Amino acid sequence: MLQNYHIYVINIMLTEKDLKQIAERGISEKQVEAQLKQIAEGFPFLKLEAAASTEKGILAPSNDEKAQDIKAWDNYKAEGHKVVKFVPASGAASRMFKNMFAFADADYDVPTTDFEKKFFDHIRNFAFKKELCNKCKENEGKDIKTLMADGEYKAIAKNMLEAKGLNYGQLPKGLLLFHNYEDEPRTAMEEHLVEAALYASSNGEANVHFTVSHEHLPLFKAKVAEKEEKYAEKYGVKYNISLSEQKHSTDTIAANIDNTPFRNEDG
């Protein structure tokens, strides 16, 4: 009875426009129904048996075993086998910054939660600190240190998240400055190019395939093209880089707090 009622509620919630958008993405009504049902019921935590360790699942090869494994891999590549580094890169960074989005919209102006306090206490350590500081100077006329001294923490958060600044709230995670080095920071995408050159190249060529979301494809292509030559020259390899889009049929519906489908202003 409850299941039939749930199906009835789903049916009356979906408009003709909803059904059209769902069909265009290759998603069935039953899939949407199942997604909303799971959102309503919640996602149970997995019950862990124990922490992973060398006694439970983690391998700890000896130095001799490591050397043998490396030799076997190098021999495999030397035989002319094609190696492709596959990188799922369609994830958006919005979830990474959900706490900072909440702070930007909060009814208080200074860091209050433990997360907010830690974020600003360690902001100097982030790989994107220099770029963020430059955006703050450009948009606010002050650097990060001065903004913090003046209590303008939200200005820093907004310059990190919004399009006027770094736009990190909307970028794919692969294009965020992720690691800091003495000479310069690198995005996650750049690190994959480096890794491909170091351990996945064969006969002087490194093959890399990125999967990205449709909306990020042009920017991702541009950023890859911008960095490809630099790392090809640095590591002495020729890159063969391809990109594909994640299928819309893998999308999950967004829901409001009352479990009704979330819609933009245009429906």
Q: What is each residue range found by the language model?
A:
Residues 14-54:
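N-terminal regions that are enriched for targeting/export leaders
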Residues 22, 44-267:
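Domain-scale recognition of functional cores that engage charged ligands
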Residues 1-12:
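Short, Lys/Arg-enriched N-terminal segments with co-localized hydrophobic residues
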